[in-house]
């Protein structure tokens, strides 16, 4: 997995990708509130040579801290969209845990 940064006006969002086939689906893992990318360590370990992968530290979580607390769920979905567009992830399969599930539904 390669760590990358998406810059916003409120702070930086850290995320990790492993793209092995640009034409295949990408498993997009979104941790819940108070969790970070490490929540999905076992899943990433299992899938990393089988699928394209994406995971982030949501705004104001772990590596994505400091981050100004002036955002809502729609902002998170917008930033996720910007990142997926930038990474040219066209076939996301979104797996969200707790608050990550809300972001997935909003996306």
Label each region the model flagged:
Residues 1-12:
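N-terminal cap/lid segment of alpha/beta-hydrolase-fold proteins
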Residues 9, 34, 74:
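Conserved phosphate-coordination/catalytic loops
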Residues 10, 48-50, 89:
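Short, well-ordered coil/turn elements that cap or connect secondary structure elements
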Residues 14-66:
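Conserved HGGG/HGGXW glycine-rich cap/lid loop of the alpha/beta-hydrolase fold
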Residues 42, 106-107:
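Active-site signature of alpha/beta-hydrolase-fold catalytic machinery across serine-
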Residues 54-95:
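Active-site loop/oxyanion-hole signature of alpha/beta-hydrolase fold enzymes
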Residues 80, 104-105:
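Aromatic/hydrophobic pocket-lining residues that form π-stacking "cages" and hydrophobic walls in ligand
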Residues 96-100, 104:
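Gly/Ala-rich beta-loop-alpha elbow adjacent to hydrolase catalytic centers
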